[in-house]
Amino acid sequence: MKISILYSSKTGKTERVAKLIEEGVKRSGNIEVKTMNLDAVDKKFLQESEGIIFGTPTYYANISWEMKKWIDESSEFNLEGKLGAAFSTANSIAGGSDIALLTILNHLMVKGMLVYSGGVAFGKPKTHLGYVHINEIQENEDENARIFGERIANKVKQIF
């Protein structure tokens, strides 16, 4: 089984969180994972992935233009039936990350992906729409990113 983590990052913060999520996926065991910046996507690995996690910085309560452009131009990939999840980074808790996550999730559903957030059933961290990493809060944030990755990996194994 394979999981791709796709992200855009200008300052390195979203890239750092993508790598933390990758650590969580690896904790789940028996899943090959690759973390890729949107400008260096391994097309073969992505197409072979059962799960894809999308990550974006939050700008003005929205996704990065790079993520939007990639989604708009990704018709070469058949994502139907794959498990999709999303995470975002923001400088503050009121930065609009929930709206950014919903934007990604809407696009994933249009592409026919199954959408999973990690949910609230397993307790903290509760990820209603996906994982949000707030840059100004550090306590437990790194571990929460790992837990999110592990939960997505476990769901991929359960479904596929």
Curated annotation (Swiss-Prot):
Domain of life: Bacteria
Gene3D superfamilies: 3.40.50.360
GO cellular component: membrane
A molecular-function term among this protein's GO annotations: NAD(P)H dehydrogenase (quinone) activity
Pfam families (UniProt xref): FMN_red (PF03358)
UniProt cofactor(s): FMN
SUPFAM superfamilies recorded: Flavoproteins
Classification via PANTHER family: FLAVODOXIN-RELATED PROTEIN WRBA-RELATED, FLAVOPROTEIN-LIKE PROTEIN YCP4-RELATED
Summary of the function given for this chain in its UniProt record: Low-potential electron donor to a number of redox enzymes.
Homology family: Belongs to the flavodoxin family.
Designated name of the protein: Flavodoxin
Organism classification: Bacteria, Bacillati, Bacillota, Clostridia, Eubacteriales
